[in-house]
Amino acid sequence: MSDALPMSPAEFEQALRAKGAYYHIHHPYHVAMYQGRATREQIQGWVANRFYYQVNIPMKDAAILANCPDREVRREWIQRLLDHDGAPGEDGGIEAWLRLGQAVGLDPDQLRSQELVLPGVRFAVDAYVNFARRASWQEAASSSLTELFAPQIHQSRLDSWPQHYPWIDPAGYEYFRTRLGQARRDVEHGLAITLQHYTTRAGQERMLEILQFKLDILWSMLDAMSMAYELNRPPYHSVTQERMWHKGITL
């Protein structure tokens, strides 16, 4: 197939958007959450594990910046770091996620400790950051295009969670509201980079595989949570009820 003619920009964008069929909004764990069937433990488990993703996103974006020689791209991409880490004197998305944790009944210090992060989630997120460090900056930037589908998932939480989970403090939804606008802005930039960079059929097919890789990461995170919080089979469940898994190895 790589010998075929390249897709036009419109066709390539359509192929990218078609990957939305595999976005984690369709994972049974997410479906249960927005349909109101999730338990308190399942929501808390999702918030705690997703926090590891949140704190690593700036690491991913910093890797892209470090590998990118284009000053104009860096000037725009750096906003993603500020969105999550916060500008001087301002809170960012990480603090907003900590407030979401408090809203669902989790202690911020426990979230920061990452003691609840499942190995499967940690491995998936670490693979994403490692990819961003080793790939070309264009490929790493393009891997962020799961943001094409992000506004829908944030809106689904805002629409359904207040109705189904009145025990959650509404102040915790700030992160989802903020990301609605940020994700749409980020998509425009990431999509422009992608459509400009991948102009051969082989390159376009590789990009579709990169996007699938990112989708695999998001889906695998929820698979790990399903095992732990839906099937009650966390790591080592057959030999102990303690959380024996590692809490992160510093290299």
Curated annotation (Swiss-Prot):
Family annotation (SUPFAM superfamilies): Heme oxygenase-like
Enzymatic reactions: 6-(2-amino-2-carboxyethyl)-7,8-dioxo-1,2,3,4,7,8-hexahydroquinoline-2,4-dicarboxylate + 3 O2 = pyrroloquinoline quinone + 2 H2O2 + 2 H2O + H(+)
The keyword DNA repair appears for this protein: no
GO BP, sorted A to Z: pyrroloquinoline quinone biosynthetic process; sulfur compound metabolic process
The protein, known as: Pyrroloquinoline-quinone synthase
GO molecular function terms noted in the UniProt entry: pyrroloquinoline-quinone synthase activity
Pfam families tied to this protein: TENA_THI-4
